[in-house]
Amino acid sequence: MTDLNQLTQELGALGIHDVQEVVYNPSYELLFAEETKPGLEGYEKGTVTNQGAVAVNTGIFTGRSPKDKYIVLDDKTKDTVWWTSEKVKNDNKPMSQDTWNSLKGLVADQLSGKRLFVVDAFCGANKDTRLAVRVVTEVAWQAHFVTNMFIRPSAEELKGFKPDFVVMNGAKCTNPNWKEQGLNSENFVAFNITEGVQLIGGTWYGGEMKKGMFSMMNYFLPLRGIASMHCSANVGKDGDTAIFFGLSGTGKTTLSTDPKRQLIGDDEHGWDDEGVFNFEGGCYAKTINLSAENEPDIYGAIKRDALLENVVVLDNGDVDYADGSKTENTRVSYPIYHIQNIVKPVSKAGPATKVIFLSADAFGVLPPVSKLTPEQTKYYFLSGFTAKLAGTERGITEPTPTFSACFGAAFLSLHPTQYAEVLVKRMQESGAEAYLVNTGWNGTGKRISIKDTRGIIDAILDGSIDKAEMGSLPIFDFSIPKALPGVNPAILDPRDTYADKAQWEEKAQDLAGRFVKNFEKYTGTAEGQALVAAGPKA
């Protein structure tokens, strides 16, 4: 839709008036010129780096702001959304229609009378279920970010484009009435599912737009029987699809970027009758400690049209990827075609036959790989476990566990069991097997090597794990292989990595207790009760 008169009317219907000029679906050339032009100040200013990519700063918010996330409570959402509660806290806090109206007025006022960038794009590679998304912003690099991250429409698709969801990004405005309205702060990321609008105020972080639309796909798709997943995905030469679930830092992007297989996508996917499809048209990779040696694909993708966030740019234009002084969450967004080995022309493939859950276990308890039963698949999917090592004041490094339902609780709009049901149903239809892979630590105190982890992934994907002789691990009742090609056999049973097996037993009992306690939130239903048997025995 390039009729600017009609577009101006549609902006008017959102309360955005007296627009000076609309820059509609700008080209990469124009975006580059706009975000680096002389006279830009503060967080609007982009800096050109020696790799050709533009670097920007997002201010005090260098990550999402989950405490400021709200969804309007109305007839449509009251019985569908997984609302936060005293018993089980989550990020889906209810907002009244009155408060919403006030915030929408604030953002509309901020965007009125300005020169605006409007980007029309798609979220979802399948025509039947994709969301047509319109992003309205006054900031050039935010238009660049969504051009990278969403699916870029053809000229034909832009004719008669009607948005299903509008993102009104008012990063420069804050809410003075937040206290009286009972909100968390002057900043806000709010959704009105009935109106099909997302409002952003006070935060410049690009990921709010990406993950905002992910949360909306997570609302609409499962209600239609389609799995909506926080995972990466790739496909082999024989058309065999694999999906990798995991929280941040567990290896989703690294392990799915594999020279032997084509990348479907690195973060958000759906699974319908036809198969697995990407929601996005780009990647959003972490860049802390990035090197050309360790991650050549991602490093090579950082060139003209890529957009770096919160990195340190030296005076000579080089980027110091080891410098996390602004944030450890330094990022780059780039169009997916910056990666060589991708599925073309549309990021989708057949139904998955291998489902891999990645956990980085800092407790040193979980085996490097276990094959899961259907009940265990549901249990460990709902648990969504990983653990980080955090230094304490006395220099002792203690593991801190994270349980995030479906490996992405922050983005779930419906109750976690709805995602588990749809995933298991899809797996049953395709005959998919599930595996739990620990990319974390063992009894040696060292992290399992990337070489061994890649060997394990290869064994899962080429089917050799299914031919391996299996043993059993007590407490968790995991089925574990005794040997795999190219993998150090001494690590496959975690008990063998301890000088004293009783030490593993003690740690395993502790971790099992944490799993059991976390799973109590699901035991309110008969199905949840039944799944307890698939979990560890503390």
UniProtKB/Swiss-Prot annotation:
Which terms in the GO cellular component ontology are assigned?
cytosol
Q: Where does ATP bind?
A: 211, 230, 246-254, 295, 331, 447-448, 453
Q: A Pfam family for this UniProt protein?
A: PEPCK_ATP
**Which pathway is recorded for this entry?**
Carbohydrate biosynthesis; gluconeogenesis
Could you give a single Gene Ontology term from the biological process aspect?
gluconeogenesis
Question: Where is Mn(2+) bound in this sequence?
Answer: K211, H230, D267
GO MF annotation, one = ATP binding
- Requisite cofactors: Mn(2+)
EC number in record:
4.1.1.49
> Which of UniProt's keywords are assigned here?
ATP-binding, Cytoplasm, Decarboxylase, Gluconeogenesis, Lyase, Manganese, Metal-binding, Nucleotide-binding
Q: Does the keyword ATP-binding apply?
A: yes
What does the entry's cofactor note say about binding and number?
Binds 1 Mn(2+) ion per subunit.
The record's HAMAP family line, in alphabetical order, gives:
PEPCK_ATP (MF_00453)
Q: Spell out the protein name for this chain.
A: Phosphoenolpyruvate carboxykinase (ATP)
Natural source organism = Mannheimia succiniciproducens (strain KCTC 0769BP / MBEL55E)
Q: What is the lineage of its organism?
A: Bacteria, Pseudomonadati, Pseudomonadota, Gammaproteobacteria, Pasteurellales
